[in-house]
Curated annotation (Swiss-Prot):
Organism: Trichinella pseudospiralis (Parasitic roundworm)
SUPFAM superfamilies found in the cross-reference section: Mss4-like (SSF51316)
Function: Involved in calcium binding and microtubule stabilization.
Entry keyword set: Calcium, Cytoplasm
Gene3D superfamilies, per database record: Metal Binding Protein, Guanine Nucleotide Exchange Factor, Chain A
Protein name, UniProt field: Translationally-controlled tumor protein homolog
Xref: PANTHER family: TRANSLATIONALLY CONTROLLED TUMOR PROTEIN-RELATED, TRANSLATIONALLY-CONTROLLED TUMOR PROTEIN
């Protein structure tokens, strides 16, 4: 399994147990599902729960939400639904990413391509009809403010509305488990 951790906060943001695609070499889009499950239960895509599980008949607390958000304990950050706050955040976050890319020895050509592709991505997010539908989440750790936002958008996929979790590729560390 591959875990995607935030480059700056170290928080686990997603894993390869969810269908994903890379867009424009800058954004991973993970397809999640809206789920209802026992509080704290983690269900991996393709897992087969045991038929032998014993039910003691006790009342259980349930939770509902996006499986990716629940599995990785992401925290909703509604303040970023204010477009000005989001713009300020993305501007500062981009500066940090570019500085990190430079310190890691990335070529100027690579950095320029990244900036161009990110500009296109951010411009598409900021369209009023689209931006007002987005949800924002951060990692659960104490350094979450240092990291990136997981941006969620609901889209029609095969006749059902599914949550798409968007993460900036260059802001992730890939960890094999």
């Amino acid at each position: 399994m591959i875990i995607y951790r935030d480059l700056f906060s170290g928080d686990e943001l997603c894993s390869d147990t969810f269908p994903m695609k890379l867009v424009n070499d800058v954004v991973f889009e993970f397809t999640g599902k809206h789920v209802v499950r026992k509080l704290g239960e983690v269900t991996l895509e393709g897992a087969n729960p045991s038929a032998e599980e014993f039910d003691e008949g006790t009342e259980e607390q349930m939770e509902s939400g996006i499986d990716i958000v629940l599995n990785h304990q992401l925290m909703e950050m509604p303040m970023y639904q204010d477009i000005k706050i989001f713009k300020d955040w993305i501007k500062e976050y981009m500066k940090k990413l570019v500085e990190k890319m430079k310190s890691d020895g990335e070529s100027e050509e690579s950095i320029s391509k990244f900036k161009k592709n990110m500009q296109e991505y951010v411009t598409s997010l900021l369209k009023k009809d689209r931006f007002k539908e987005l949800q924002f989440f951060s990692g659960p750790g104490e350094n979450a403010a240092e990291g990136q936002l997981a941006i969620v958008e609901y889209r029609q996929v095969s006749d059902t509305e599914q949550p798409i979790v968007m993460l900036i590729k260059q802001g992730l560390v890939v960890e094999k488990c």
